[in-house]
A protein has these predicted regions:
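Basic nucleic-acid-binding interfaces
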Residues: 2-103
Length: 103
């Protein structure tokens, strides 16, 4: 992740979604559309005819399946954490969380 360019174009909704993904305990109400919006902001997302989503982050392609409901399940959160950590976004999530703690 290039911090100077990638962190700048994340709006507050993207940052909130990123923090929710890395939140402990795991959040059970992360909206699929919010996840797609975040992934589209930091990489590329292409939907296939089979309903799968090809997500490319930092040159690495991942395949995701649309959830049955509007929110993603715990396994998808785990997969997203892995993908985002590999792309350097765990640090940004921690920074955003720490900023929110400052009063």
């Amino acid at each position: 992740m290039n911090e100077s360019s990638d962190a700048v174009h994340l709006n507050n909704h993207h940052r909130d979604t990123l923090v929710s993904i890395f939140q402990h305990p795991t959040s059970h109400n992360i909206d699929w559309k919010a996840v797609l919006s975040l992934l589209g902001a930091i990489g590329t997302v292409q939907e296939t005819a089979e309903g799968k989503y090809h997500v490319t982050l930092d040159g690495t392609e991942h395949v995701m399946t649309r959830p049955r409901h509007k929110d993603i399940d715990v396994q998808t959160v785990v997969d997203l954490r892995r993908m985002l950590t590999e792309s350097g976004y765990a640090e940004l999530a921690q920074e955003v969380t720490d900023e929110g703690k400052e009063v």
